[in-house]
Amino acid sequence: MENVEDKYNSPLKSQKLFIGAQICLRIVTIGATLAATWIMVTDKQSITFGDFVMVAKYNYSSAFKFFVLANVIACACSVVSLLFLCALGRYSSNPGHVFLLFLHDLLMMSLVLAGCSAATAIGFLGKYGNTKSGWMPICDQFGQFCNRGTISMMLSYLSMVCLLILTVTSANKSRQIHV
């Protein structure tokens, strides 16, 4: 019975599972942040009222600019961390290396969460407005712009969840550090 438990709970199998999960989650994070960035950057809609043309673009809002920048940074840093993880390969069981991944994932998760929060706040104003401040909703007129922005934010929230899972797994693995 002990041999069966040792076989399924061996450190090597645990290490392979950890690395496999890390690689898969980082690939999903890279894809989600890249897609969120691309959708938001290409999000533009124009409407015409007689001779007057109104345009909605992501770069008209500092919150959307921050959202895009946060996703670009998270995507680039996730690519670097994926390369770091692949380069370490067998040596990634070093608790010091895992702790660096934990810090990286925590910072990237915080950055993506901040970007998502800023974009969500502006998206909420765009959808519902704020009558007390005199801000009217614009999503009635700019439906395509708002829908694409919503998809971009959903992808970014997906990447934030992946980064949260990476943070938790790295924190769990780095508990082996002996001071």
UniProtKB/Swiss-Prot annotation:
It is found in: Cell membrane. It is a multi-pass membrane protein. The chain crosses the membrane at residues 17-37, 66-86, 106-126, 151-171. The keyword Transport does not apply. Residues 38-65, 127-150 are extracellular. Residues 1-16, 87-105, 172-179 are cytoplasmic. The keyword Magnesium does not apply. Keywords: Cell membrane, Glycoprotein, Membrane, Transmembrane, Transmembrane helix. GO terms for cellular component: plasma membrane. InterPro entries: CASP/CASPL, CASP_dom, CASPL. Glycans are attached at N59. Pfam families: CASP_dom. Belongs to the Casparian strip membrane proteins (CASP) family. Homodimer and heterodimers. NCBIfam families: A_tha_TIGR01569. This is CASP-like protein 1F1.
